[in-house]
């Protein structure tokens, strides 16, 4: 009975959520679109003609926003473990990003192109136990940073969902070695009870002289 009540409360919160209603009205696949739109409004992160990688893309809310902003001259490579309905001019790679074969598929899709921006809204399935969830979340963050270090052009940018807890401070220090400017963002469209924040790193310096970050 308690579980049924919890499910009912979640559904009520979901459908009463103004961002869910806005997404339905505006044609976005998820409320997450407004998190990226809010960051974009503040930081002007995405520009026409850019090459972008979107990790944790399904159901496609961030990809929809990014595709519109980069326009026909831009290029977007998206990936998720879940299926995602196609979006025009978006290359989608389905698979588990923790597996090397999926990394290789992404790198193959990138080819010799230098990437302007890597964005990641990835998160593990949460158990509610911090001792379990934080290592899983940080593992995904490390892998996303590893990819960014491989593909970003000098001066490129990196936006990633993070959860503060064990391992975050070391991760934050690693990023500060690789980028000129690092800031935290908490969009108003992110639910108050959510521990998520977004780390925005700008001005990729390249890996020369910085700590080597190895893929696990």
Curated annotation (Swiss-Prot):
Superkingdom, natural source: Bacteria
**Swiss-Prot/TrEMBL catalytic activity:** uridine(2552) in 23S rRNA + S-adenosyl-L-methionine = 2'-O-methyluridine(2552) in 23S rRNA + S-adenosyl-L-homocysteine + H(+)
Q: According to the UniProt record, what class of enzyme is this?
A: transferase
Q: Which SUPFAM superfamilies match?
A: S-adenosyl-L-methionine-dependent methyltransferases
A GO term for molecular function: rRNA (uridine-2'-O-)-methyltransferase activity
The catalytic residues are: 161 (proton acceptor)
Q: Which GO terms describe its cellular component?
A: cytoplasm
What UniProt keywords are attached to this protein's entry? Cytoplasm, Methyltransferase, rRNA processing, S-adenosyl-L-methionine, Transferase
Q: What is its EC number?
A: 2.1.1.166
Residues noted as binding S-adenosyl-L-methionine in the record, renumbered to the chain: 60, 62, 80, 96, 121
Q: Which Pfam families would you find in this protein's record? A: FtsJ
Locations listed in the record: Cytoplasm
- First-listed, main subcellular location of the protein, grouped into a coarse class: cytoplasm
**Family matches, as InterPro entries:** RNA_methyltr_RlmE, RNA_MeTrfase_FtsJ_dom, rRNA-MeTfrase_E, SAM-dependent_MTases_sf
Ribonucleoprotein as UniProt keyword? no
Q: Which HAMAP family match?
A: RNA_methyltr_E
Purpose of the protein = Specifically methylates the uridine in position 2552 of 23S rRNA at the 2'-O position of the ribose in the fully assembled 50S ribosomal subunit.
Say which family it is in.
Belongs to the class I-like SAM-binding methyltransferase superfamily. RNA methyltransferase RlmE family.
Q: What is this protein called?
A: Ribosomal RNA large subunit methyltransferase E
State the organism of origin.
Pseudomonas savastanoi pv. phaseolicola (strain 1448A / Race 6)
């Amino acid at each position: 009975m308690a579980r049924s009540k919890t499910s009912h409360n979640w559904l009520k919160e979901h459908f009463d959520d103004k961002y869910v209603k806005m997404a339905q009205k505006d044609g976005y696949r998820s409320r997450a679109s407004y998190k990226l739109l809010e960051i974009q409004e503040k930081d002007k992160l995405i520009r026409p003609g850019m090459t972008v990688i979107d990790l944790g893309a399904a159901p496609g809310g961030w990809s929809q926003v990014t595709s519109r902003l980069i326009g026909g001259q831009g290029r977007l490579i998206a990936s998720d473990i879940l299926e995602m309905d196609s979006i025009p001019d978006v290359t989608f790679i389905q698979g588990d990003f923790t597996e090397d074969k999926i990394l290789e598929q992404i790198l193959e899709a990138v080819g010799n192109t230098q990437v302007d921006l890597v964005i990641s809204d990835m998160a593990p399935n949460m158990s509610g136990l911090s001792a379990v969830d934080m290592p899983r979340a940080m593992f995904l963050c490390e892998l996303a940073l590893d990819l960014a270090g491989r593909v970003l052009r000098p001066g490129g940018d990196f936006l990633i969902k993070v959860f503060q807890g064990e391992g975050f401070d070391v991760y934050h220090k690693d990023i500060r070695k690789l980028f000129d400017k690092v800031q935290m963002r908490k969009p108003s469209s992110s639910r108050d009870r959510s521990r998520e924040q977004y780390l925005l790193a700008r001005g990729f310096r390249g890996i020369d002289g910085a700590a080597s970050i190895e893929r696990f």
